[in-house]
Amino acid sequence: MGKRILTVGEPMGLLIAQEEGGLDEVKHFTSAIAGAEFNVAVGLTRLGHTVGYLTRVGRDPFGRQICRYMKQIGLDTGLTRVDQGRRTGFMLQSRTSQGDPDIYY
């Protein structure tokens, strides 16, 4: 049995461009979840630890996606709150074959 761990952070929706070009020109995106602490929580859960995630998401498509994924992988959602009055943050990421992608929050 793994250790019990608590992580605290801000998960975000992530839209990743599926073709190269400026984000104002791209037509197709893939939806994912981002956030440094979220990634740590997911990794620790996959290693067999019991992980709680203290956070707040909005009652919106990104918030629902995040909560659904947390439950799907077995991440403890007992300390995750859904806020009626706020939206979940998100970021846009460009696709590039050279250098770093453009990222907007």
Language-model features: locations:
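Conserved N-terminal subdomain of the carbohydrate kinase-like
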Residues: 50, 54-105
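Short, surface-exposed alpha-helical segments at coil->helix boundaries
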Residues: 34, 38, 64-67
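Gly/Ser/Thr-rich helix-start
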Residues: 10, 35-36, 59, 90
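Positively charged, low-complexity intrinsically disordered leader regions
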Residues: 1-23
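Alpha-helix C-terminal capping segments
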Residues: 32, 39-50, 95
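Short pre-catalytic strand/loop immediately N-terminal to key active-site residues, enriched for Gly-Thr
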Residues: 24-34
